[in-house]
Amino acid sequence: MQFVLHKTASGVTRARRGTVHLNHGDVQTPAFMPVGTYGTVKGMLPRDIEAIGADIILGNTFHLWLRPGTDIIDKFGGLHKFMHWDKPILTDSGGFQVFSLGAMRKITEEGVTFKSPIDGAKVFLSPEKSMQIQYSLNSDIVMQFDECTPYPATHDEAKKSLELSLRWGQRCVDEHKNLGSTNALFGIIQGSMYADLRKQSLEGLLEIGFDGYAIGGLSVGEPKEEMIDVLDYIADDMPADKPRYLMGVGKPEDLVEGVRRGVDMFDCVMPTRNARNGHYFVTGDADNAGVVRIRNSQYRTDEGPLDPECDCYTCQNFSRAYLSHLNKCKEMLGAQLATIHNLRYYQRLMQNIRDAIEQDKFDEFVNEFYSKRGQTVPELNLR
């Protein structure tokens, strides 16, 4: 993997424009990665994902390991061939899914024992096993196995958790090397909401050495203000010559705020999940903060496109009234068209951000973005 930093935005912002060169292609940053948990982005054919402009998607190590299993995916030569996607794939390590199991899991120094959510069988996942699974999947970007610190957590709990993740991180690097993998391996910064612990985690990861660095342990129930605080005091300390990835975040404004603080990569289920629930992201609509809730009665006879500024297949061919009809009837096509639009909205957002950085107009872009949504630009408190 190679990361090339092309430009940093002018002014006080830390926004960056770059390219991540990976085994299956290049990723233009800042980038948003659609989530394909089970080897598919819900409601999307691979050609649809490419058409909306995605350079990279995210797969889920935990779920693909349990079903269909790496033995089956191995027969196809990896996840790319299994799902017919020839561009880059990032896979998470399984740490967040294990975290979400709650009482169903037991964490030790060696790894995590839990009951499979599929059949209740006892399963063990370790840093080494996570690396082996991701090696079988042939992910372009492999994530270290970590413990996602819950929120809230005491200082002692968060410290103990991050130190376990650091030890696991070293084991991940060792196993990654033993496997002879040529794919990139990213470390994950933990430490809950504590500035000193976040810095301790980052320093520990830098000593181990990774190809890129991710900010984990956010979007786990904390107030947005605390999430932004973490970004304010950690993002700029991350190496300038490595990709910076904010995991599991989020709303369009969260992406903009992450970019303002120097983040390069994002993923979240929000655009696809919200699409299935009839919530569509649009460029304007200041009265509704950039969201059309298609179930509202006002759209029942609306002849206009979902988003007049959008070039996606949905907006170019269908009215809000038709989308309202499909949603009310619970037709599969409605969810598919909604997903196409929401993911295209996110990709257009990132493209517009990249263009604005290149043209030294990022501050103007930010002002216009919030103005169209009827929102004020949040303060930037970089430390």
Curated annotation (Swiss-Prot):
EC top class, in one word?
transferase
Family annotation (Gene3D superfamilies): Queuine tRNA-ribosyltransferase-like
According to its UniProt record, which cofactors does this protein need?
Zn(2+)
Q: What domain of life does the UniProt record list for this protein's source?
A: Bacteria
Q: Which GO terms describe its biological process?
A: queuosine biosynthetic process; tRNA wobble guanine modification; tRNA-guanine transglycosylation
The record's cofactor note says: Binds 1 zinc ion per subunit.
Q: List the GO cellular component terms.
A: cytosol
Q: Hey, which pathway is this one from?
A: tRNA modification; tRNA-queuosine biosynthesis
EC number per UniProt? 2.4.2.29
Residues binding Zn(2+), per UniProt: C310, C312, C315, H341
Binding of substrate: at which residues? D92, S93, G94, G95, F96, D146, Q190, G217
Reactions performed catalytically: 7-aminomethyl-7-carbaguanine + guanosine(34) in tRNA = 7-aminomethyl-7-carbaguanosine(34) in tRNA + guanine
Q: Which GO terms describe its molecular function?
A: metal ion binding; tRNA-guanosine(34) queuine transglycosylase activity
Coiled-coil residues are none
Q: Which UniProt keywords apply?
A: Glycosyltransferase, Metal-binding, Queuosine biosynthesis, Transferase, tRNA processing, Zinc
| Active site, renumbered | D92, D267
Q: Which cysteines does the record link by disulfide bonds?
A: none
RNA binding as annotated region, ranges: 248-254, 272-276
- Report the protein's function: Catalyzes the base-exchange of a guanine (G) residue with the queuine precursor 7-aminomethyl-7-deazaguanine (PreQ1) at position 34 (anticodon wobble position) in tRNAs with GU(N) anticodons (tRNA-Asp, -Asn, -His and -Tyr). Catalysis occurs through a double-displacement mechanism. The nucleophile active site attacks the C1' of nucleotide 34 to detach the guanine base from the RNA, forming a covalent enzyme-RNA intermediate. The proton acceptor active site deprotonates the incoming PreQ1, allowing a nucleophilic attack on the C1' of the ribose to form the product.
- Similarity-based family: Belongs to the queuine tRNA-ribosyltransferase family.
Note the PANTHER family from the entry.
QUEUINE TRNA-RIBOSYLTRANSFERASE
| Subunit structure, as described in the record | Homodimer. Within each dimer, one monomer is responsible for RNA recognition and catalysis, while the other monomer binds to the replacement base PreQ1.
Q: Any idea what this protein is called?
A: Queuine tRNA-ribosyltransferase
Task: Tell me the organism.
Answer: Psychrobacter cryohalolentis (strain ATCC BAA-1226 / DSM 17306 / VKM B-2378 / K5)
